[in-house]
Amino acid sequence: MYRLAAFDMDGTLLMRDHKIGSITLNALHQLADAGVTLTFATGRHYLDMKGILSHSGLNGYLITGNSTRVCDAEGNPLYGMDLPAELVEFVLRTPWQTNASIHLFRDDGWFTDRNDPDLLIAHTTSGFHFQLTEWDELPLTGNHKFCFIASHQELVELKAQLEQQMSGEADFCFSATDCLEVLPRGCNKGVALEKLSHHLDLTLADCMAFGDAMNDKEMLSRVGRGLVMGNALPQLKQELPQLQIIGRCEQQGVAHYLHHWLSSPHLTYSPEF
């Protein structure tokens, strides 16, 4: 039996309205009652996640900011990584050939120089919001990650620029088709979950994980059982063909799988609804 379950949020636990469905909530509570440690592994900020979990009546370990921070259920930090100050300065001062908006995340919040209220729709439950700033007003240290937001094709072109200029100095991943992230080198959900597992005297083989995007790849590929959402990015499905595909987030596919696993863990699972 798996002793820890790690869940991505957007496109996995959350439905298209950015909320956790009632069937999913029920399944998560059943899982916790069965003695399985809940872990939420997401690109979202710690403050955002605490609001979501409080609203939902859930508790668990948190891997946030795409693994730049790991906290226990009480919010105590267990592990963290920041971008090097010189890299932050380089990203902010380089005139990239793009119309993408840029967003910087720190312990004290989400910062941007572009006011786009539409981005707040995904954070209605928690009330988490960006803070408008001038980039030269922020410290160059203590920064978790950058996000660039634009159309996918524009971000593909930007990623090529970033990789050419910063090859080997940072990691890049698509947490959504319209969101490109710049992360500390070697920072991913697989590494973070391994550190958390060690803290809990577990191994990755003791874990199951659910995800839908490229920032979930390392986590899904390294755990004892990785489950790919039906709505996952095509690239993720292509790169992890050995993993089982379950239902879609809008169908509360995670709950469907968990109910099956809790009641009939040794039977073959079918994602049909």
UniProtKB/Swiss-Prot annotation:
Enzyme class: hydrolase
Residues that span the membrane, as ranges: none
InterPro entries (alphabetical): Cof, HAD-like_sf, HAD-SF_hydro_IIB, HAD_sf, HMP-PP_phosphatase
Family recorded in the similarity comment: Belongs to the HAD-like hydrolase superfamily. Cof family.
Enzyme nomenclature, EC number: 3.6.1.-
SUPFAM superfamilies: HAD-like
The reaction(s) this protein catalyses: 4-amino-2-methyl-5-(diphosphooxymethyl)pyrimidine + H2O = 4-amino-2-methyl-5-(phosphooxymethyl)pyrimidine + phosphate + H(+)
UniProt organism field: Yersinia pseudotuberculosis serotype IB (strain PB1/+)
HAMAP family: HMP_PP_phosphat (MF_01847)
An MF annotation (GO) of this entry: 4-amino-5-hydroxymethyl-2-methylpyrimidine diphosphatase activity
Residues annotated as catalytic: 8 (nucleophile)
Protein name as it appears in the record: HMP-PP phosphatase
Keyword field: Hydrolase, Magnesium, Metal-binding
Binding locations of Mg(2+): 8, 10, 212
Highest rank taxon of the organism: Bacteria
Role description: Catalyzes the hydrolysis of 4-amino-2-methyl-5-hydroxymethylpyrimidine pyrophosphate (HMP-PP) to 4-amino-2-methyl-5-hydroxymethylpyrimidine phosphate (HMP-P).
Cofactor: Mg(2+)
